[in-house]
Every structure is written in structure tokens, then in C-alpha cells.
Curated annotation (Swiss-Prot):
It is an enzyme of class 2 (transferase). This is Ribosomal RNA small subunit methyltransferase G. It catalyses: guanosine(527) in 16S rRNA + S-adenosyl-L-methionine = N(7)-methylguanosine(527) in 16S rRNA + S-adenosyl-L-homocysteine. S-adenosyl-L-methionine binds at G73, L78, V124, E125, R139. One of its GO terms (cellular component) is cytosol. The lineage of its organism: Bacteria, Pseudomonadati, Pseudomonadota, Gammaproteobacteria, Enterobacterales. The keyword Cell membrane does not apply. The keyword Transferase applies. It comes from Salmonella typhimurium (strain LT2 / SGSC1412 / ATCC 700720). Belongs to the methyltransferase superfamily. RNA methyltransferase RsmG family.
Length: 207
């Protein structure tokens, strides 16, 4: 699996250390193992996880601004854990309301010795934002409207919302509340992944 990951990274133009690659493969191994009992993802094949979970997460890294991020509705740690591995100087709070997912995240944190993640079991609306975050990240979490409505209290003054989407969500962008606007839309290239992938970056229009 390490060789396949190395080939995917080379195809994507992403350079990682051997240690980072080893951690990513170890995470996939854990996800595959725990998935049998905990049903954490519909993807069953570890090689497919490399594309649909690992690469699909880390291609976002160049667009993130800041040091403190919160991954809302993280599920089994996506995209937060792969991003934490490739961005060791940033910190990621991994938020999910389901206890079984958070138990898995804590086990990953323990086994991979990831000091830059904080797994939290909470509903996003109830989670405090002190200190505020530089970025709020979501992948398959909610519509853009729901994301900014439920998470509006989390980013700081210059914080951003980063929403990973498939096809360009034109209707969702058009229905954003007036106090939020799209700063940019980035088309993402994920080797061996069928279909389009986009990153929608949203900012608050608060004066």
C-alpha cells in the first residue's frame, strides 16, 4: 500500500516525508480494521481509501490559511486526520456527535501519536469557539447554507469556511445568506478519482 500511496502522491505533485507516508498508511489500516465492527465508511477496500479518503483530503492542504482548524462532522477523521499528518504545525479539532467515531479518533491519536489533533464529541451548534478558529472545514457534512448557519460562531474575524464538494454547488452558492460570500472556488485534482471535486472557500461579510 505504501508503494501505491507514493505513486498517487507523485501523480498529484505532492511531496511528503517517509514518516508522513507511513502514518497515512497506518491510518488506512486502522480505518479498514475498525470499519468491520464500527461501520465508519462505505469504502471497504484499503486501496480505494487511499484515493477517496487520503488523496481527496490532502489536496486541500495548500489552500488552508492559519494554524487552528476545526473539522466539523469529521466522521472517522476526514479530512482532519490526513491534513493533520501533512500539516504537522497546524492543529485540528475533530468534531463529531457520535461516540463510536470519537472513540476511533482517540485510538488513532494514541496509536499514531498525533499531538496536533483533538477529538471532541459534540454537536457543532453547542461547541464553544474560544479561542476562535482560523478555519472551519467540512467534507460531506451539510449544504453551504447549513454549514455557515450552524458554524457561524466558530471562525475568528479573518477565519474562513472550507467546504469540500463534488460538482460545483451553484444552487448552494446562490442561496448563501447575505452576510457570507464566496471568496474562491478551487477545482481539485485527485488522481484516479472519478467525478469532479471542488473546494469552496467562504468568508463572513461582518464589518
Amino acid at each position: 500500500m505504501l508503494n501505491k500511496l507514493s505513486r498517487l502522491l507523485a501523480d498529484a505533485g505532492i511531496s511528503l516525508t517517509d514518516h508522513q507516508k507511513t502514518l497515512l498508511v497506518a491510518y488506512v489500516d486502522m480505518l479498514h480494521k475498525w470499519n468491520k465492527a464500527y461501520n465508519l465508511t462505505s469504502v471497504r477496500d484499503p486501496n480505494e481509501m487511499l484515493v477517496r479518503h487520503i488523496l481527496d483530503s490532502i489536496v486541500v492542504a495548500p489552500y488552508l490559511q492559519g494554524q487552528r482548524f476545526i473539522d466539523v462532522g469529521t466522521g472517522p477523521g476526514l479530512p482532519g486526520i490526513p491534513l493533520a499528518i501533512v500539516l504537522p504545525d497546524a492543529h485540528f479539532t475533530l468534531l463529531d456527535s457520535l461516540g463510536k467515531r470519537v472513540r476511533f479518533l482517540r485510538q488513532v491519536q494514541h496509536e499514531l501519536k498525533l499531538e496536533n489533533i483533538t477529538p471532541v464529541q459534540s454537536r457543532v451548534e453547542a461547541y464553544p469557539s474560544e479561542p476562535p478558529f482560523d478555519g472551519v472545514i467540512s467534507r460531506a457534512f451539510a449544504s453551504l447554507n447549513d454549514m455557515v448557519s450552524w458554524c457561524h460562531h466558530l471562525p475568528g474575524e479573518k477565519g474562513r469556511f472550507y467546504a469540500l464538494k463534488g460538482q460545483l454547488p451553484g444552487d448552494e452558492i446562490a442561496s448563501l445568506p447575505d452576510n457570507f460570500s464566496v471568496e474562491s472556488v478551487e477545482k481539485l485534482r485527485v488522481p484516479q478519482l472519478e467525478g469532479e471535486r471542488h473546494l469552496v472557500i467562504i468568508k463572513s461579510n461582518k464589518v
